[in-house]
Amino acid sequence: MTEKELKKFTIGLIESKEKLNENYIRYSYYELKVKNNLSEEEIDEVLKISRNYFENKAYSVYFTNAEFEYKNAKRKVETNEYMIAFKE
């Protein structure tokens, strides 16, 4: 995937996730690695762009194995998840 195609993919992914649930965003291993066949470098770039986007919109952003609290419950970004972002 070219750099331009990857940015277009990332913007589309962000928009679709926000439409699904604007308060809780989840990127899974399956959707990035299996379904869209992204390389590790492409996944890193998608996560970097997404992190910047969501942090600029006041989301809390967490990556694989990170622990966090959401709706008064302790949670963890599981190994089959790349990223979780949310705002309360």
Walk through the language-model features, giving the residues of each:
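Short glycine-rich, basic-tinged beta-strand/loop micro-motifs
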Residues: 19-40
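N-terminal export/targeting and maturation segments
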Residues: 1-3, 25-31, 80
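C-terminal edge-of-domain segments
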Residues: 66-88
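Charge-enriched amphipathic alpha-helical scaffolds
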Residues: 39-63
